[in-house]
Amino acid sequence: MTGNEFRFFLSCDISVPVTFRVERLEGNLPLPKSPDLENNAPTDNRTTELFVECALYIDGAPFGLPMRTRLESLGPSYCWNELITLTTKYRDLTAQSQLTFTVWDLSHGEGLIGGATILLFNNKKQLKTGKQKLRLWAGKEADGTFPTSTPGKVPRHERGELERLEKLVNKYERGQIQRVDWLDRLTFKTMERIKERESLKNGSSHMYLVVDFCSFEHRVVFQESGANFLFPSPIASTNDIVVVWDPEVGKINPSEHKQLKLARSLTRGVIDRDLKPSSNERKSIQRILKYPPTRTLSGDERQLLWKFRFSLMSEKRALTKFLRCVEWSDVQEAKQALELMGKWEMIDVCDALELLSPVFESEEVRAYAVSVLERADDEELQCYLLQLVQALRFERSAKSRLSHFLIQCALRNIELASFLRWYVAVELYDPAYAKRFYCTYEILEENMMKIAAGVNGEEDGFKQWQSLVRQTELTAQLCSITREVSNVRGNTQKKIEKLRQLLSGLLSELTYFDEPIRSPLAPGVLITGIVPSESSIFKSALHPLRLTFRAANGGTCKIIFKKGDDIRQDQLVVQMVSLMDRLLKLENLDLHLTPYKVLATGQDEGMLEFIPSRSLAQILSENRSIISYLQKFHPDDHGPFGITATCLETFIKSCAGYSVITYILGIGDRHLDNLLLRNDGGLFHVDFGFILGRDPKPFPPPMKLCKEMVEAMGGAESQYYTRFKSYCCEAYHILRKSSNLILNLFYLMAGSNIPDIASDPEKGILKLQEKFRLDLDDEASIHFFQDLINESVSALFPQMVETIHRWAQYWR
């Protein structure tokens, strides 16, 4: 490249994600004051745990979810050296795009160290590259508005020799300065001495965050996507259409913006009170109210709802849509919206869950949502408890109205207390939110300890809490047992012998507990010990334990304990199966589902309820058909296919229920080993490692309906198969009516660490939304689902995959 050439890339042509590296923190942290020390003398032996929260702002508005580095506690030179990749691509940036960096400390007080903001493009509209040294504003969270109140750029009059040298280093790294090895080594040594001298001169009054922006072969110059600077000159002699670039395309129209502000002004409120929508406007409003919660409203739709806000106050479905129309940065508009919210028709619990999503940041709106949840009974709350705990991530503080509500519910119901404690305890492994969840855990413990003994012989709070703590002690011992049996060389039988040997010898205290323990899976059941002779190990790579516990009421309960497997995804899926079972039964449709209990007790451990059953693969290998197997347990010479009508009906209904549910949730990796059958004919699914459309197998059918299941119904031409299709369509129709509830629950899980959601929350929720086919009316959706069933039955490729899977199981 000659001196007169300037080669560059256009930002609109770069389709790679925005990437940068958070390197280190320079300078001394402000020392916390300790009330235990005289004159608040500083303490040097403190352990500080820092992480950096990074967020992208475009034109002063947040864009995408913030990203966080890992915790770093190897101070005082805090070095993360962590690569951060945003979902936004360079082509999507504007000239006023900014990155905000906020440093948090999880070990002291509120934990805010400081923040800084940096523009991604300089004043020449060139993308900044290389190392950037940002000054942190102590005690301030990074401000992403434009212009920002926390600029990371050091003022010109304070820049020393080091600033000039750092710019030269950036040029050196881009290859713009010739490399001379022996001279470079001397130069860098000299620079280190200058750096030490500058640090001593500046003292410890400032902190700096060093970040390294991605570098390209050439400079990157900003250009809006879609802009075309190269257009042909309009020549009179040509008949071609001339394309002219309009620089104002896509920008805010000042006239329209002014009209919008006037339309929403307070003086319009007097007129708007008496406005009634016309016939066409009413149809448009009804169409908007049917939108799923994931759909973004257009400007015209927002304006329409705002215009008729007073006439919509009697329509409870309209509140969540109306609150999405509010410009919350406008103080007067926000105030008016909150006043209307208080007078609005009370919304349903389903809509209240939507108001707890990250879209709604107003504390008043979130408090209103909690007030609606207070009307729900404990049984309904338990259906949503997992998501309500996840919603704590989106609160502004640890001591929020939602946190207080969950704790109050737990204090009056020991089962809710047990599940709340476990859900919160699992989130303590998330470094970004550990402090918040630990605060909730502490408040729950503190309040439960204060409960006095009941007049009906109920335990006091201390004993109740201790019974929950013993659950953790039990799981710790089960983890130890799992490690012991995994280390045993040999086949599964030798591992089973080792398990029973441990329970009868070294860990014999587990066979009879000193005091009964509440079952983690069913806190209403007290367990008193493990029965060694009835305990076993599954033939699997992780060697899950199958344990039989004695119950205080004289019976037994069987559980599966897994170590080394993240079952939080299974927990979510089974929770949704349980919820859908409840929704179907409310419409008088019992499909004999088996929503067995699942509880994650850690990031890689958990418990599952054991349901006596056999896999279809095992049944078909021993009995050749499902009907032959069921004839052993429910023979009836006068019944259909030689079995009782009740047994066949249970099989047909359960097949229909799980066919619909696994389709909606996009359950993948289905094979005959994770389809189980109870002796009464009830079929159910296990192992949900792939959800929301993910599947390791090529060409998966829309739903898992193998030919053996259809043959058990008498074939595709039988009346029983027709009944099966009828149940499927009825169940699909019922669940479509509750699509908003299901979508809201998944939306609240967007911040969780569940693998198939965390990888791309937005894509996963859109996949779920697609399965409901909300673009179709009821009749069209029934025809769609009937075609879907026919497509799944005719799928041949999955049958080949089943054969391959059986070969793999043989060699395990």
UniProtKB/Swiss-Prot annotation:
Pfam family, one: PI3Ka
GO BP term, pick one: autophagosome assembly
The PI3K/PI4K catalytic domain, residue ranges: 531-797
Chain segments carrying region Catalytic loop: 666-674
Induction (free text): Highly expressed in young root nodules in parallel with membrane proliferation but is repressed in mature nodules.
Catalysis performed (reactions): a 1,2-diacyl-sn-glycero-3-phospho-(1D-myo-inositol) + ATP = a 1,2-diacyl-sn-glycero-3-phospho-(1D-myo-inositol-3-phosphate) + ADP + H(+)
SUPFAM superfamilies: ARM repeat, C2 domain (Calcium/lipid-binding domain, CaLB), MHC antigen-recognition domain, Protein kinase-like (PK-like)
Family annotation (InterPro entries): ARM-type_fold, C2_domain_sf, Kinase-like_dom_sf, MHC_I/II-like_Ag-recog, PI3/4_kinase_cat_dom, PI3/4_kinase_cat_sf, PI3/4_kinase_CS, PI3K-type_C2_dom
Region (Activation loop): 685-706
Residues annotated as domain C2 PI3K-type: 14-175
EC number: 2.7.1.137
Region (G-loop): 537-543
PIK helical domain span: 272-447
Cited SMART domains: PI3K_C2 (SM00142), PI3Ka (SM00145), PI3Kc (SM00146)
Record's GO cellular component terms: cytoplasm; endosome; membrane; peroxisome; phagophore assembly site; phosphatidylinositol 3-kinase complex, class III, type I; phosphatidylinositol 3-kinase complex, class III, type II
Keywords, alphabetical: ATP-binding, Kinase, Nucleotide-binding, Transferase
Enzyme class: transferase
GO molecular function: 1-phosphatidylinositol-3-kinase activity; ATP binding
Record function comment: Associated with membrane proliferation.
PANTHER family given in the database record: PHOSPHATIDYLINOSITOL 3-KINASE CATALYTIC SUBUNIT TYPE 3 (PTHR10048:SF7), PHOSPHATIDYLINOSITOL KINASE (PTHR10048)
Recorded family membership: Belongs to the PI3/PI4-kinase family.
Protein name (Swiss-Prot/TrEMBL): Phosphatidylinositol 3-kinase, nodule isoform
Organismal lineage: Eukaryota, Viridiplantae, Streptophyta, Embryophyta, Tracheophyta
